[in-house]
Structures are given as structure tokens and as C-alpha cells.
Regions:
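Mid-sequence acidic-hydrophobic segments that form the walls
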Residues: 70, 102-109, 125, 129, ...
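Short, structured loop/turn "capping" segments at alpha-beta junctions
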Residues: 109-113, 134-136, 151, 169
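A short linear-motif detector with a strong N-terminal bias
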Residues: 57, 77-78, 129, 166-171
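C-terminal end-helix/capping segment
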Residues: 154-178
Length: 198
């Protein structure tokens, strides 16, 4: 059952809260370790994260779909694609240049072996890419590597959900998350799900 795969409703306080327990029942296990999580090509996950910067989830998904119809989500294809083609998909110049730099660095091996590195080392490596900051690296840790304990306190959706459900101000989010170590990615995922729940 999903509950058996959960990182222990009894093992940490996440599901002791009635609101979070309800989200767990509705949405099932979060897609991070130790639960099964999708294995996806690192370049594609990062490209999607760059596209998603400062956009709503829905707008980002539409833009990524349009982009990948024009340019396949591989480093080689993005290296060869003219900048104008990336702009034609609806990307800002800054995002188009970031994706070109990501493609070049991926071809040089920057994305190799990330799954063997600690979270901090992954962030350090990824933020060498133009236009990739802490938020984009955190999204990759979660959705590219399935890391269970990422707490992206700068994320606007997370801030909105935490304020709505728990009355937590943005500056209090780091301390609020401490109680949920080592499964803060799971907490973030349920908070995001809450934004699309009645």
C-alpha cells in the first residue's frame, strides 16, 4: 500500500498533522526517496527548471512543451539550435542564453555523476551554469535526483502554502522546516499540492 512505502508516518511528524495526513491520503506518497521516483534525463529536468523560473507551474509546462517541440531536450540539439529558435518558443533572451550555456557545459560533462554527489556539491556544480541559481538547483535535487530533504524556502508557492496552512511567515520557514528533517522535500511537495486543492 502507499502507506507502507511512505517514509514512515510514524517515523517523523509529517503525517501527524491532520491537514498533511489528508493530503497524503489524497495524493499518495511523494516522488522522492525512499519512495520510488521517476528517473529522468538530467539535462531535460534542468532545462525544465530554467524554463520554469518565475512562472506558474501551468505556464512553465506549456512553455516547455512548445520549446521541446521545436528543439529536442538534448544538449546536442540545444547547442545546435539558433538562439532565435529558442526565442521563437517564447523564451526570454536570458533563459535562451542559460539553456545554451547548460547545453555546452553538459556536453563537457558537468551533469555526469551528479547522483553520486552530496546535495551541496550538486548545488555548487549546477550554479556554475549561467542563469542557474539556488532555486533551480534545488528543483533539480528534488525532481532530478529524488533527494528527500530539500527545503526550497525561496519558492513562492511554498511560501504561499505555508502561510495559508500554518500561518508561517517566509522568514520563519527555515526554522519551521527543521522539525521535518530528513524529509523536507516530502513536506514541500504536499504544500505545493495544497495550492491546487479546494
Amino acid at each position: 500500500s502507499p502507506r507502507a512505502r511512505s517514509p514512515g508516518p510514524r517515523g517523523f511528524g509529517l503525517f501527524e498533522h491532520p491537514v498533511l495526513a489528508a493530503f497524503y491520503r489524497r495524493h499518495g506518497p511523494a516522488p522522492f526517496a525512499p519512495n520510488p521516483f521517476p528517473q529522468r534525463p538530467p539535462f531535460r529536468v534542468l532545462a525544465e527548471s530554467v524554463v520554469a523560473q518565475q512562472l506558474s507551474t501551468r505556464a512553465a509546462a506549456r512553455l516547455a512543451e512548445r520549446l521541446f517541440r521545436l528543439v529536442p531536450p538534448t544538449p546536442k540539439a540545444f547547442l545546435e539550435a539558433p538562439l532565435d529558435l529558442l526565442r521563437q518558443a517564447g523564451l526570454s533572451r536570458a533563459k535562451a542564453l542559460a539553456l545554451k550555456d547548460l547545453a555546452a557545459k553538459a556536453e563537457e560533462g558537468l551533469l555526469d555523476g551528479l547522483d553520486r554527489l552530496e546535495d551541496e556539491a550538486v548545488v555548487e556544480r549546477l550554479t556554475r551554469v549561467r542563469g542557474v541559481g539556488l532555486w533551480t538547483a534545488e528543483m533539480f535535487l528534488m525532481f532530478g535526483l529524488g533527494r528527500p530533504d530539500v527545503w526550497p524556502v525561496r519558492d513562492l508557492g511554498l511560501r504561499r502554502a505555508a502561510a495559508r496552512l500554518f500561518g508561517v511567515a517566509p522568514e520563519a520557514l527555515p526554522a519551521f522546516g527543521e522539525a521535518f528533517r530528513p524529509y523536507r522535500s516530502h513536506l514541500a511537495w504536499y504544500l505545493w499540492r495544497s495550492l491546487s486543492s479546494p
